[in-house]
């Protein structure tokens, strides 16, 4: 491993890892759309205009920075160290997944795609993606296991209210793993017009990098808030 380079950014330009555990294990049909997304993301994450656009929407739409507060009662109850909390639930939609969804929609707009698809289990990733898609004028398709749809009706209703098409998946266990597979199949068949948003740090390497890059907004805010509150970032003891 290279020193002082995050593990997530190591490997070659297309995310390939060599050595004993290396490889780019995706079906041949996924290779081209994944490589296209990798090239686009590697370019835009260094583009000052794109970063400024991202930061503008994070501030004026997502609601960054979110609060950093001391939990006075819990600190007094437990004693010893001060206990603080980063209130990420302050973000638009109430979940950290809004950062990833926002960046994916910005990438989709830059690539000229009109549709964005995504998978969801509990419904939060789907809800955030439906919100971002509505904000940026994209059609949104959310794949969700039939069992999860029955369990998570509030989030299903929220997605539909935002204009998303919620597509039930009846194959396999009818849960998230099957929704991911169906979403990927749809993306591969429609990659000329459609972008895909993976809701977490899973899947092909580029999706992991996009998610990490997007949600690192939380840690950037936290570092600034720590310095503002304590004068420096607390050291591990």
Predicted segments with their positions:
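PLP-dependent amino-acid enzyme catalytic core
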Residues: 1-237
């Amino acid at each position: 491993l290279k020193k002082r380079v995050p593990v997530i950014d190591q490997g070659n330009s297309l995310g390939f890892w060599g050595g004993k555990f290396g490889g780019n294990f995706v079906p041949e049909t996924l290779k081209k759309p994944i490589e296209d997304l990798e090239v686009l993301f590697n370019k835009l994450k260094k583009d000052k205009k794109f970063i400024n656009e991202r930061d503008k929407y994070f501030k004026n739409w997502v609601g960054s920075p979110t609060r950093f507060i001391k939990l006075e009662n819990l600190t007094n109850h437990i004693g010893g160290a001060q206990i603080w909390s980063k209130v990420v639930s302050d973000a638009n939609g109430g979940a950290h997944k809004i950062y990833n969804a926002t960046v994916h929609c910005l990438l989709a707009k830059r690539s000229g795609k009109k549709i964005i698809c995504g998978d969801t289990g509990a419904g939060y990733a789907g809800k955030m993606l439906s919100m971002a898609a509505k904000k940026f004028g994209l059609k949104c398709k959310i794949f969700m296991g039939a069992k999860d749809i029955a369990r998570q009706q509030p989030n299903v209703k929220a997605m539909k209210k935002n204009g998303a098409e919620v597509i039930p998946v009846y194959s396999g266990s009818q849960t998230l793993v099957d929704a991911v597979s169906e979403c990927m199949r749809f993306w591969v068949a429609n990659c000329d017009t459609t972008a895909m948003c993976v809701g977490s740090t899973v899947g092909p390497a580029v999706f992991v990098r996009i998610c990490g890059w997007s949600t690192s907004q939380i840690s950037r805010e936290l570092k600034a808030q720590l310095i503002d509150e304590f004068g420096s970032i607390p050291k591990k003891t």
